[in-house]
Regions:
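Feature captures the catalytic ectodomains and active-site-proximal regions of enzymes
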Residues: 1-113
Length: 113
């Protein structure tokens, strides 16, 4: 008997979305954690300040959480062109799509023992 698994998947990111964040925000392109996060286009990401929305433990300071939706990835306004050139049409980790959250597992058994 053999169990076969792999890392969770990634998603092909095609569309940038501008996020406004302070310098101490996380560096991920598919999610952001930081103080006072704001989005240029709110329909492109899930944004919350409530840890319970994400089933996370309570933070000791005011923290915002942004999770990119669909095939979006976060860029900063002052580095928009650079990030578009570098990351458009690339496979990225870190969002809330099924591809990124589900870990595949298969059990292989011989036909007869």
């Amino acid at each position: 008997r053999v169990l076969l698994t792999s890392d969770h998947g990634s998603i092909l990111c095609r569309r940038p979305t501008v996020v406004y964040a302070q310098k101490d925000a996380s560096s991920s392109l598919r999610y952001k954690i930081g103080r006072d996060l704001r989005l240029e286009n709110p329909e492109t990401a899930f944004l919350t300040k409530a840890e319970e929305d994400l089933r996370l433990p309570s933070a000791s300071f005011a923290t915002s959480y942004a999770l990119a939706l669909d095939d979006h990835y976060f860029v900063y306004q002052n580095r928009l062109r650079e990030y578009q050139r570098r990351y458009r049409n690339s496979f990225l980790h870190g969002g809330i799509s099924p591809e990124e959250m589900i870990v595949p597992v298969v059990e292989l058994k011989p036909r007869s023992e």
